[in-house]
Amino acid sequence: MPHAGRHCLSTKYRDMGIFGFFNKNKKETLDKGLEKTKTSVFDKLARAVAGKSKVDDDVLDNLEEVLITSDVGVDTTLKIIKRIEERVARDKYISTSELNGILRDEIAALLAENNSDDNDNWELPADHSPYVILVVGVNGVGKTTTIGKLAYQFKKAGKKVYLGAADTFRAAAVEQLCIWGERVGVPVIKQQMGSDPASVAFDTLSSAKANGADVVLIDTAGRLHNKVGLMNELKKIKDVMKKVLPQAPDEVMLVLDGSTGQNAFEQAKQFSAVTQISSLAITKLDGTAKGGVVIGISDQLKVPVKYIGLGEGMEDLQLFSKRQFVDSLFKKD
């Protein structure tokens, strides 16, 4: 059995040459990743305004259906429709050809209200070292993979990264994190199966602090079916972290699978009831037409989307930019 606080960093890293293959232009990756969502929305919008020259009640009813079936969510859809109704009432006449641009503007405004910044130039705060990110989410959403990709990108930016395997209930979770640690070339702190997750978090932060780390990413169990147990576990992890670093965690990031649409929204609501969430990472947007869920989740939770996953590659986890997201979604070919 591995002893407490053991590193599972291999001295023999995997071939790092593969990463060069994924070094694509970020905007191209975003456009490609949102292609299915964009095509679906455009097709539905075309049907919504078919035979109409101006935006009227029928068009708005059709638009409501377009947004709901694009996984924007009912409450957020009604909010967008209300804003467009107000513009129609104010301007008296809006042609259907203007609808695309108006919709883009309203969605961008909505994302701005929810603190979803244009994160193009986001930097680690200089006064928080190490910067600690507690990562939560149910199993299967791409949580550990997201941690691995973040570790890669932070390391590539010249940061010293530590990973903590605090999902001690699943051997596969620890093994997967260790594989990512080897692949990226960063240490992973782990304990034996069934250990106290808070103890793993303590060891990880202690080691990271002692070794001058810049970033710490802590993986956690996603046992949402046991809400009270999960709530207590996350509270204990946070309390123990503060014994090492009083400001920790700096960020609690919820990872959601965008391809599940409204299920992701339900998970987000349930996790928000369990612990305070400060940022969202929405994965698997490249293989789905359900990208509208990004808009609804951000609006309803009032939590900023920070990262979006647009493919399998290391570079395909991007900092979220509301401006680029909306531009890609509504860009006419």
Language-model-detected regions and their locations in the chain:
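N-terminal accessory targeting/assembly segments
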Residues: 9-46
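Short beta-alpha junctions and helix-cap segments that line functional grooves
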Residues: 18, 119-121, 150, 266-268, ...
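Primarily NTPase-proximal linker/entry elements flanking Walker-type ATP/GTP-binding cores
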Residues: 31, 35-166, 173-193, 201-209, ...
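Short hydrophobic/aromatic residue motifs in ordered secondary structure
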Residues: 74-76, 170, 286, 314
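Conserved catalytic-core segment of NTP-binding enzymes
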Residues: 176, 196-211, 225-331
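Short glycine-rich anion-binding loops that position phosphate/pyrophosphate groups of nucleotides
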Residues: 221-223
